[in-house]
Every structure is written in structure tokens, then in C-alpha cells.
């Protein structure tokens, strides 16, 4: 099993360079899935504990690697401050050895601390990297914890977890509307919608598909299909 977690253009080894050894290749990106003939999975979120703060100390947070988008993210932060909002953006280098190459780079932060700050924010920023069209882990974190999402990824509207009260597309809406958006209550997702984005659901579907293959070999009825993934 091989899973591309980022856009394929960021990987040295492309799908057509992988030996035909019976591996299944998966991606979170629908465009990459179609382009390279890979299996598409909507999400593999691992459910964890935690609860968002009732008294957040910042409006929008972002903790992530540069990936060629740092200048745009920091510029967005300045625009938010000009609107009277309180963003907290920390950019890390793509590799640790690059830490001192740019003055705004911050040391790597443990994921536990990132999640803690995300839960103490009114919203989290998800900024597209080059070649990305699928949703990211940040999107799924927000949906799981009920933290609002600010993003420039228009593809989010194609997903059934999208709700305009939960997701602010800042390239489609004026930034001046962000403050009022943050005041609107988060709309909780239906459990049957959310579960499709969890790793437990994906594993269950793989097992079901394997059982169906065994049944076909035995000449038994196929049962339900897992093609909806």
C-alpha cells in the first residue's frame, strides 16, 4: 500500500516509476488520481481527543512548512491585522537545515502543540501548495473539532463536509466579511458524513472489498460495492 499525502509533483518517485509489484497507490488529490490512474480516498483522519476552547486567544492560526507559499501567507496575515483581527502564523522551513535561510522561519513545533493552539483559535488557515487540489489534514482537523476553516482551495465546495458557515473561501469572499463569519456558530456535520473521512472507515471498506473478492472467487454473491470511495 502506497499513499501520496502531498501533491505528486512534490515527490521524487512518481507513480509510473513504482515497480509493478502488486502495490496499491492512493492519493487524497482527485486531480492526481485521475491523471495518474490512482485510487482516490477522501480522507484518512485518525480521530483523537481534545476540545476547542470557549475563549480562543487568536482569530486565525497557521503552523506549517514554507512549500513556496510563505510570502503569500505572511502577506495575508498583515491584511488580517489591518482589519483588526489577530492572526498567529508560524512558517517552518521545508527541511530543518534551512532554518536560518529566511528571517521569518520558526523551529519545528511538535504536533501536540500545534493542535493545542488550533483548539485555542477561532479558525485555522489552510493555504494551497503548488499542484494541490484535494483537501488537507487541516481541513479534516477543523471539521472534527468544530474549528472554522479559512482557505483558498475552491475544491472544498465539491466535498460533502463543506458548509458556508464553517468554511471561508477568501478568494471568493471579501476579507472584510471574515470577522462576521467568525461570529456565526459552527454547523456540526452529520456523523454519517464525517465517518467517510476517517481511517477506520477506509480500513473497513478495504476489508469489505477483500471479502467481496474472495466471495467472487468462490462464486458467491458480490454484495455491496465499495466503488463510492
What name fits each language-model region?
Residues 16-19, 53-61, 100-105, 180-187:
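Short, surface-exposed amphipathic charged segments that create phosphate/polyanion-binding patches used
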Residues 1-81:
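Catalytic core of nucleotide-activated saccharide and alditol-phosphate transferases
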Residues 211-229:
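Non-catalytic N-terminal targeting/anchoring module and adjacent flexible stem/linker
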Residues 10-15, 46-50, 109-113, 137, ...:
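A generic local structural motif
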Residues 26-34, 91-96, 152-157:
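Short, polar loop motifs at secondary-structure junctions
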Residues 100-104, 111-209:
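Catalytic binding pocket for nucleotide-activated donors in carbohydrate/polymer assembly enzymes
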Amino acid at each position: 500500500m502506497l499513499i501520496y499525502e502531498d501533491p505528486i509533483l512534490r515527490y521524487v518517485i512518481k507513480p509510473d516509476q513504482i515497480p509493478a509489484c502488486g502495490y496499491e497507490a492512493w492519493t487524497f488529490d482527485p486531480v492526481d488520481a485521475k491523471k495518474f490512474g490512482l485510487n482516490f480516498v477522501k480522507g484518512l483522519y485518525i480521530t483523537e481527543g481534545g476540545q476547542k476552547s470557549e475563549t480562543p486567544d487568536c482569530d486565525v492560526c497557521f503552523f506549517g512548512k514554507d512549500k513556496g507559499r510563505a510570502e503569500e501567507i505572511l502577506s495575508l496575515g498583515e491584511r488580517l491585522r489591518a482589519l483588526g483581527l489577530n492572526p498567529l502564523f508560524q512558517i517552518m522551513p521545508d527541511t530543518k537545515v534551512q532554518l536560518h535561510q529566511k528571517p521569518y522561519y520558526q523551529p519545528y513545533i511538535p504536533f501536540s502543540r500545534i493542535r493545542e493552539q488550533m483548539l485555542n483559535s477561532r479558525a485555522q488557515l489552510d493555504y494551497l501548495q503548488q499542484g494541490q487540489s484535494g483537501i488537507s489534514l487541516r481541513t479534516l482537523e477543523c471539521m472534527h473539532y468544530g474549528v472554522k476553516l479559512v482557505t483558498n482551495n475552491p475544491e472544498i465546495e465539491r466535498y460533502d463536509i463543506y458548509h458556508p458557515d464553517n468554511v471561508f473561501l477568501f478568494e471568493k469572499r471579501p476579507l472584510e466579511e471574515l470577522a462576521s463569519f467568525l461570529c456565526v456558530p459552527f454547523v456540526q456535520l452529520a456523523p454519517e458524513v464525517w465517518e467517510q473521512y476517517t481511517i477506520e472507515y477506509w480500513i473497513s471498506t478495504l476489508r469489505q472489498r477483500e471479502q467481496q473478492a474472495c466471495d467472487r472467487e468462490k462464486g458467491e454473491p458480490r454484495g455491496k460495492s465499495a466503488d463510492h470511495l
